[in-house]
Amino acid sequence: MIAAPFDAVADSTGKKPFYSHLYVQVLAAIAAGILLGHFYPELGAQLKPLGDAFIKLVKMIIAPVIFLTVATGIAGMSDLKKVGRVAGKAMLYFLTFSTLALVIGMVVANVVQPGAGMNIDPASLDPTAVATYASKAHEQSIVGFLTNIIPTTIVGAFADGDILQVLFFSVLFGIALAMVGEKGEQVVNFLNALTAPVFKLVAILMKAAPIGAFGAMAFTIGKYGIGSIANLAMLIGTFYLTSLLFVLVVLGAVARYNGFSILALLRYIKEELLLVLGTSSSEAALPGLMNKMEKAGCKRSVVGLVIPTGYSFNLDGTNIYMTLAALFIAQATGINLSWGDQILLLLVAMLSSKGAAGITGAGFITLAATLSVVPSVPVAGMALILGIDRFMSECRALTNLVGNAVATIVVARWENELDTAQLARALGGQAEESAPAGLQPAE
């Protein structure tokens, strides 16, 4: 159910009761969804519209949030060269860790070999089961992806909710505002004033998060069943463990080097993580993540550039999944890939993960795009993991979210746009207790 406004409900110490916290409500909704989907699968399978409706509500507000954050952030920059530096450093970070994620997935697949011993005849696989994904994969290309960043019309970019197109226009508009100087002050003031109702709307929409998480989880368990995990438990377990180690070890080392704790960051964004877990959509947490990163001391200009771009270029979880799943299919079908074949797979995955970014079902479609170029592994082999992809998509989205949170703090620190004292307070829990739910307009 929709969370009530608990602001007025507090105990004698002035603290809110535990059940008033969004993460508690979402966690309870996820548990309820699992139980309903398991014991009443037919009813659970019919609750998909609840999750879809919530995700659509959030997507409705993503474009205004990105526009206001980026445009006002860049307009307030005294040095426009910073825009290029921030973007360049962000892309360097994305390329480094996205490639590392691909390599880690490949190494783990070779060591654990989750598909070994299955001995599946490739000729027995039904290619029609993945035909839709394969056709979408063939439609993607690097050139097409890059040209598609430029919107045909401004209205079209906002109407379609295309994150990169909205970001592209917002950056140009913010630069134009900064260049006109005093003439643009009234526009900047108007946009800053407009942030209040828009970001208050974000807080209101988040009240519906438990409903969305409940419906999405009930549908997932009701339609696919917990039992469907058992047959491919080795692959699922390997992927979840690899992603967990990537977050705690790799991103943990990056966090430690940059002066903060990955565990403290995970606690800080726990509401966004649970939201992603319940809905299997990282986009559902985008407004909240931008909110949290700005409250954690990252300048708005950095937050507005890094996070939306990272949602297309910094997909650590998706990249781990791509190489791990590709080698699983090869192992399950008895195909022995040489190191040359695997290096080719890695290079193709580096490109296809960018060409298919930002599209619906990106993880599975990107895998199809990669396998269609690598002749050694049959695309039809994707039918083996089609039934469990929904369970793996949650882990992909969670890892992607954490990766973008870490990237934002790191890039902000590189650019000296990070308030380290504010970051320490936020990760220590002080900012979370005092700050409202919506992203705060610039002062």
Swiss-Prot record:
Example of a GO biological process term: L-aspartate transmembrane transport
Keywords: Cell inner membrane, Cell membrane, Membrane, Symport, Transmembrane, Transmembrane helix, Transport
A GO cellular-component term linked to this record: plasma membrane
Signal sequence range: none
UniProt topology in membrane: Multi-pass membrane protein
Transmembrane feature ranges: 17-37, 57-77, 92-112, 139-159, 161-181, 201-221, 234-254, 320-340, 368-388
Pfam families (alphabetical): SDF (PF00375)
Main localization (coarse): membrane
Molecular function via GO: fumarate transmembrane transporter activity; malate:proton symporter activity; succinate transmembrane transporter activity
Physiological role: Responsible for the transport of dicarboxylates such as succinate, fumarate, and malate from the periplasm across the membrane.
Protein name: C4-dicarboxylate transport protein
Protein's organism: Rhizobium leguminosarum bv. trifolii (strain WSM2304)
